[in-house]
Design a protein with these regions (language model features):
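Conserved SGNH/GDSL esterase-like catalytic core that processes O-acyl groups on lipids
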Residues: 30-33, 39-123, 270
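Conserved catalytic region of serine esterases and O-acyltransferases that act on ester linkages
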Residues: 28, 201, 211-274
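Short, surface-exposed connector motifs at secondary-structure boundaries
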Residues: 28-33, 140-142
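N-terminal secretory signal peptides that target proteins for export/translocation
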Residues: 1-5
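Boundary at the C-terminal end of the N-terminal hydrophobic targeting segment
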Residues: 21-23
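Bacterial N-terminal signal peptides
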Residues: 7-18
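Short alpha-helical patches at coil-to-helix transitions and adjacent helical residues
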Residues: 42, 204-211
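Alpha-helical cap/lid subdomain in secreted, periplasmic
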Residues: 88-207, 216-225
Length: 274
């Protein structure tokens, strides 16, 4: 075989290797961008969402994020960084299917330190409306990441859920009901810890639950059957770290993983039936 024919042969082999197997369709991809704070970067939630999707039959979710610890959405709005962050390749060619917005855990209000009561979510509502407008101008769909109540004040979920669902309805934007799934797990399996010691941030199981809810909300597909272990980009207290070496983000028992997947799917389906 001469050099020219050998080169053509290798090119054909590479094309065939990259093509879908006969009878199979290439998987769809959803590009998802997360905006928020440590409730996103703890345990690398975007990486968990991506890792879960790789092992399921639905679309593959490719993710990126823009986060600052403790940030409110109004601060993401005022610092003006979001449009450039969404153009992560430095050009106007980057597009996103969904941009997920996560508010500070107390809905950007003052929490009563005795009762845990939250104030009016007016700042949250205004910021979401303004950010959603920016997101839609860039051709993406805004989605909302409903957070959970603090361990100390489980009744906070009533206000949190109402605020997210209210603004989601106003904007016709999907709401990932992570907080509601969190409450369901805490009620049914109080032995299955979702918090770290501060009673606010998620441990790996909590972030895994959030990832399952997010996957179900954005794809409309069940997360049941997702892997119990997920590897991805490592993270620290300041956010995801640049590294070529994947880290183990979560490792659950098969029973715990299956339970979290089932609750996530059940809660998302119940929410959509409202």
């Amino acid at each position: 075989m001469n050099v020219e024919m050998r080169g053509l042969h290798l090119l054909l082999l590479s094309v065939l290797a990259a093509a879908p197997v006969a009878g199979q369709e290439a998987r769809d991809t959803l590009d998802v961008f997360f905006v928020g704070n440590s409730y996103i970067y703890f345990n690398n939630l975007p990486g968990l969402v991506e890792g879960i999707s790789e092992k399921l039959d639905g679309p593959h979710l490719k993710t990126a994020s823009h986060t600052h610890g403790g940030h409110r959405l109004s601060e993401h709005l005022s610092d003006g960084h979001l449009p450039s962050a969404l153009q992560s390749d430095g050009s106007m060619s980057q597009t996103w299917d969904f941009v997920v917005l996560q508010e500070q855990s107390a809905l950007a209000t003052v929490t009563d330190t005795v009762t845990g009561e939250l104030g009016s979510p007016v700042e949250f509502q205004r910021a979401v409306h303004d950010l959603a407008s920016q997101v839609r101008n860039l051709g993406a769909t805004p989605a909302l990441y409903m957070t959970w109540a603090k361990r100390r004040w489980p009744a906070q979920l009533t206000d949190i859920s109402a605020a997210y669902r209210g603004v989601g309805a106003e904007l016709d934007a999907p709401v990932a009901p992570v907080g509601e799934a969190w409450a369901a797990v805490s009620t049914r399996r109080p032995d299955l810890e979702l918090f770290v010691a501060d009673g606010s941030h998620p441990n790996p199981a909590g972030s895994y639950l959030a990832a399952c809810v997010m996957y179900a909300t954005l794809t409309g597909r069940s997360p049941v059957g997702a892997p119990r272990e997920v590897w991805g980009q490592p993270w620290n207290g300041a956010g995801p770290m640049e590294s070529d070496t994947p880290a183990l983000l979560v490792s659950l028992t098969a029973a715990d993983a299956a339970f979290l997947q089932e609750v996530a799917w059940e809660v998302v389906n119940h929410a959509e039936a409202r």
